Amino acid sequence: MTKRDQSLATPYLQFDRTQWAALRDSVPLTLTEEEIVKLKGINEDLSLDEVAQIYLPLSRLLNFYISSNLRRQAVLEQFLGTDGQRIPYVIGIAGSVAVGKSTTARLLQALLSRWPEHRSVELITTDGFLYPNKVLNERGLMKKKGFPQSYDMHSLVKFVSEVKSGADHVTAPVYSHLIYDIVPDGNKIIKQPDILILEGLNVLQSGMDYPHDPHHVFVSDFVDFSIYVDAPEDLLQSWYINRFLKFRQGAFSNPDSYFHNYAKLPETEAVKIATQLWKEINGLNLKQNILPTRERASLIMTKSANHAVESVRLRK
């Protein structure tokens, strides 16, 4: 099979790092090194070069898509003879635990909000739509947190549907990784943003992933552009363990932390527990429920060591 035949056989355009970086064009870097440090995750080496070569071209592409969507809305309003109602553009970001979804989401929020159009960009994680621990315990699902059955999908779909319908304000519950639970009365209010970034394990899932709870509309039905952050499983496991060890030295030392009892563990024991958690929960969820959604994404970013993106696939 020739290279052209291989290209025609896939629904994606494929770029290596150099090819993708060239698509930045002349987009200026609007973030300082200090701001990037604040945006990056606990376990990631995020450089100015990474932002310039990977995330600036991505923000440029998204800006084109968003502008095109606004023009399409204007055409519809002209046809209907109606005044414009602001309908948010929804970007979904999916991928495994520890792959760096949150950093990608925060970076895009910062970059997209600094385009000349000064668009308002809100960020919501689907963790907020996990059932509270009390419910998960009652249903025997604490070891399935993050699996499809651990989410209140009806509430999540209702939230995204209301945002996408242009509701004045919509309320989302907030999840705390410190207490490992939904924050009581910790709701976040979303007020008609131009862009909503929805980050979570499950934003690309569909009816096939929820046979236990059949319903006909899914989060993916409301997503305008979706990104899957990918990496080999051996790297994901290593990043998860390293993140666990850093939390053990930091967040776990807080007496309010759900995992406070892990703070004083010897490192060898902590590695053993983190490895077990990966194999029994996160790695299993990746194989069964997350990885199968990858090819539904509009764009796939594949990372190598040190969280550096080595290739990008963009749906044709």
From Swiss-Prot:
<keyword id="KW-0067">ATP-binding</keyword>
<keyword id="KW-0547">Nucleotide-binding</keyword>
<dbReference type="Pfam" id="PF00485">
    <property type="entry name" value="PRK"/>
</dbReference>
<feature type="binding site">
    <location>
        <begin position="95"/>
        <end position="102"/>
    </location>
    <ligand>
        <name>ATP</name>
    </ligand>
</feature>
<keyword id="KW-0418">Kinase</keyword>
<dbReference type="GO" id="GO:0005524">
    <property type="term" value="F:ATP binding"/>
</dbReference>
<protein>
    <recommendedName>
        <fullName>Pantothenate kinase</fullName>
        <ecNumber>2.7.1.33</ecNumber>
    </recommendedName>
</protein>
<dbReference type="GO" id="GO:0015937">
    <property type="term" value="P:coenzyme A biosynthetic process"/>
</dbReference>
<dbReference type="InterPro" id="IPR004566">
    <property type="entry name" value="PanK"/>
</dbReference>
<dbReference type="InterPro" id="IPR027417">
    <property type="entry name" value="P-loop_NTPase"/>
</dbReference>
<comment type="pathway">
    <text>Cofactor biosynthesis; coenzyme A biosynthesis; CoA from (R)-pantothenate: step 1/5.</text>
</comment>
<keyword id="KW-0963">Cytoplasm</keyword>
<keyword id="KW-0808">Transferase</keyword>
<dbReference type="GO" id="GO:0005737">
    <property type="term" value="C:cytoplasm"/>
</dbReference>
<keyword id="KW-0173">Coenzyme A biosynthesis</keyword>
<dbReference type="InterPro" id="IPR006083">
    <property type="entry name" value="PRK/URK"/>
</dbReference>
<comment type="similarity">
    <text>Belongs to the prokaryotic pantothenate kinase family.</text>
</comment>
<dbReference type="GO" id="GO:0004594">
    <property type="term" value="F:pantothenate kinase activity"/>
</dbReference>
